[in-house]
UniProtKB/Swiss-Prot annotation:
Keywords: Cell adhesion, Cell membrane, Cell projection, Cytoplasm, Cytoskeleton, Disulfide bond, Glycoprotein, Growth factor, Membrane, Pyrrolidone carboxylic acid, Secreted, Signal, Transmembrane, Transmembrane helix. Glycans are attached at N90, N97, N145, N196. This is Kit ligand. Pfam families: SCF. Residues 1-25 form the signal peptide. Residues 26-215 are extracellular. Belongs to the SCF family. Disulfide bonds join C29-C114, C68-C164. It comes from Sus scrofa (Pig). The gene is KITLG. Residues 239-274 are cytoplasmic. The modification Pyrrolidone carboxylic acid is found at Q26.
Amino acid sequence: MKKTQTWIITCIYLQLLLFNPLVRTQGICRNRVTDDVKDVTKLVANLPKDYKITLKYVPGMDVLPSHCWISEMVEQLSVSLTDLLDKFSNISEGLSNYSIIDKLVKIVDDLVECMEEHSFENVKKSSKSPEPRLFTPEKFFGIFNRSIDAFKDLEMVAPKTSECVISSTLTPEKDSRVSVTKPFMLPPVAASSLRNDSSSSNRKASDSIEDSSLQWAAVALPAFFSLVIGFAFGALYWKKKQPNLTRTVENIQINEEDNEISMLQEKEREFQEV
């Protein structure tokens, strides 16, 4: 019986190990992002609208894949948030500006550490350092939120291109979160991709989705088949052991009956002797 229990426990651990790769595909740094990022809205409301925050904006956020800029962008966000933290006094109130910024700094620092552990080999950084720019709180934390969203889905998947060049001549795209100070000077890869029509872009997007689905299937199918095989072996093992267990129970019952008969015979002999 103990051997059967040990075998069942072994099967459970085996299935956990088989499904472990599925957990790893959900974003390499996803667990570093806490619910404290939701306080960004409160922080933006507390800061003056015309307040300026210095940030060395990493070009390429709007034209290159996230793995091309996320590592350097999070480092610059850490520097800017730390500098912003130093400008506020340490207030004990739970939702004070200092408290919120301090939590955001910890999140960003954890992301920096995570990216150091999971570096992308195909990213070739620009030789020029990003130039510092001034952003309003709304635009600055718009960049922050965009970087956090990129981390939630970031996976260690090798990009198709051999390298992605981050050009220092690129500037933020003009939208509700980021302003433009200079025209775009796109790197060769990005420029050639933007020359394609909308149908080509849609095809690339669909190809990306298909590639992601294939990568997921490549991990899920082996784990699924391993799970089925594991349960099949478990069923065979149980069927093999079941007759043995039945015979063991029958033998025990027979031995008990024999013992009772022997005891009765012995008592009968003792009674006859008396």
